[in-house]
Amino acid sequence: MFENITAAPADPILGLADLFRADDRPGKINLGIGVYKDETGKTPVLTSVKKAEQYLLENETTKNYLGIDGIPEFARCTQELLFGKGSALINDKRARTAQTPGGTGALRIAADFLAKNTPVKRVWVSNPSWPNHKSVFNAAGLEVREYAYYDAENHSLDFEALQASLSEAQAGDVVLFHGCCHNPTGIDPTLEQWQVLAELSVEKGWLPLFDFAYQGFARGLEEDAEGLRAFAALHKELIVASSYSKNFGLYNERVGACTLVAADAETVDRAFSQMKSAIRANYSNPPAHGASIVATILSNDALRAIWEQELTDMRQRIQRMRQLFVNTLQEKGANRDFSFIIKQNGMFSFSGLTKDQVLRLREEFGVYAVASGRVNVAGMTPDNMAPLCEAIVAVL
């Protein structure tokens, strides 16, 4: 039965990590997978996380199963982070949150819930987007369409083309937006543009689905939620898939959340019962450790202050690396202007490198980037910057 199965293609991002591990060149550089690295090239455990883990170690009394939707305090903290303390939407009990195995788990639960319980048939994602978006929605039986996003010539958001391509989206279609730090371009709408999109979305009858994996990495926790909150102020219904992998450094704990918003408390409770049903048929209930860390930090003022400072430090380090990257490319004689990289948000930069140039970087210089030309700025350090930029200049 199994002998006739053909091999699946390697994942474009995780497959790259396997190639990197197998490379024995000492000066190799990994700018592929989206994890934060510090100045020494390590992915650290945050101090706030260590302190929360110590607290949990001393105070945890059971390893019993969680409920289907996870830890209630985690859900409460998640909603406050997304919609703001004292949000009317929270006070009116219009939101319900399920703790999920990572942001990917949240997206898949949202997809399964929509496919089974609503007339939704189509999901619109930006071109380009995170490659796994298409796989997740297709796996749930939903059609994926693309809307224009990136102006490659000017390295900017092509807002006119975005609006024009979304004019084909029909009432009842899902439109997926990146909450901030658009992956892979690093280019986000302005608040005014978010406002236009929120109004257009209501007018056209789309269901907004926010993929929110990088809150705190663009400008700050509150600022990065402005786009989502513009939608939440106007929409009766929306879904948010959020992740704590990046902003808490909890990559291997798989901590995510799927938040459902409806017109009133009674409707959201009824709809959420079906979301829980989708979870039960998938993984039954989520693991406790990572979400316990997040809930512990967010509900403790002292730990939260440490975490917010650590998040600020991570964000500022990435911004410094963007500046250093652009300066060093110039110093090494790059024959084109890379200053647009400074304006991008979050971990990633859409470098403008071609597939062939990316391949040459890997084969000749041991520099690993995604074929699309996306590079992880958080993988850059003052030590690897010169060899990295020399390699890029050599392949331009």
UniProtKB/Swiss-Prot annotation:
Enzyme class, spelled out: transferase
Gene Ontology cellular-component annotations: cytosol
Major place of residence: cytoplasm
Name the record gives this protein: Aspartate aminotransferase
Any one GO biological process: L-phenylalanine biosynthetic process from chorismate via phenylpyruvate
Enzyme Commission no: 2.6.1.1
Family matches, as SUPFAM superfamilies: PLP-dependent transferases
Keywords, ordered alphabetically: Aminotransferase, Cytoplasm, Pyridoxal phosphate, Transferase
Amino-acid positions noted as binding L-aspartate in the UniProt annotation, renumbered to this chain: 34, 130, 183, 374
Required cofactor names: pyridoxal 5'-phosphate
Catalysed reactions, as listed in the record: L-aspartate + 2-oxoglutarate = oxaloacetate + L-glutamate
InterPro entries linked: Aminotransferase_I/II_large (IPR004839), Asp_trans (IPR000796), NHTrfase_class1_PyrdxlP-BS (IPR004838), PyrdxlP-dep_Trfase (IPR015424), PyrdxlP-dep_Trfase_major (IPR015421), PyrdxlP-dep_Trfase_small (IPR015422)
Subunit field text: Homodimer.
Gene: aspC
